[in-house]
């Protein structure tokens, strides 16, 4: 079975590579040192510092494994390969819900780069799925767990 690919911009991949480097070169050694110190306290069966450090080690190793997989199977998307006014990964899109005045701006990213707090939505999210492939002036229906709503695409531009 083929591995899942992770569509992303080159910038997203570089960010993941930096995060992986930080985990391997800084966080992993810090956790190993904490485990070593906790071991020196003696009896491991009732050593909460040791248990906490081992839990953190498992978390860090899980993050490393996840990032390595995403980087290994990264599919770099070139937003220049699609029409200038077409929504794709790496594009910034301004939308307006039909019947509302407020405009919303989103950056479409691969799942690895999603961060809703700063307006970066994944191509796999309901918003991303509804907008990908649409063009300026089109309308799209965004399906959410609590219902659907229609939006008009006001502007599509390459993300700076």
Curated annotation (Swiss-Prot):
TM helices/strands, residue ranges: none
A GO BP annotation: regulation of DNA-templated transcription elongation
A molecular function GO annotation: RNA polymerase binding
Entry keyword set: Coiled coil, DNA-binding, Transcription, Transcription regulation
Top-rank taxon: Bacteria
Keyword Transcription appears in the UniProt entry: yes
Entry coiled-coil feature ranges: 1-72
InterPro entries tied to this protein: GreA/GreB_C_sf, TF_GreA/GreB_CS, Tscrpt_elong_fac_GreA, Tscrpt_elong_fac_GreA/B, Tscrpt_elong_fac_GreA/B_C, Tscrpt_elong_fac_GreA/B_fam, Tscrpt_elong_fac_GreA/B_N, Tscrpt_elong_fac_GreA/B_N_sf
Keyword DNA-binding: yes
Gene3D superfamilies (UniProt xref): Transcription elongation factor, GreA/GreB, C-terminal domain, Transcription elongation factor, GreA/GreB, N-terminal domain
Protein name as annotated: Transcription elongation factor GreA
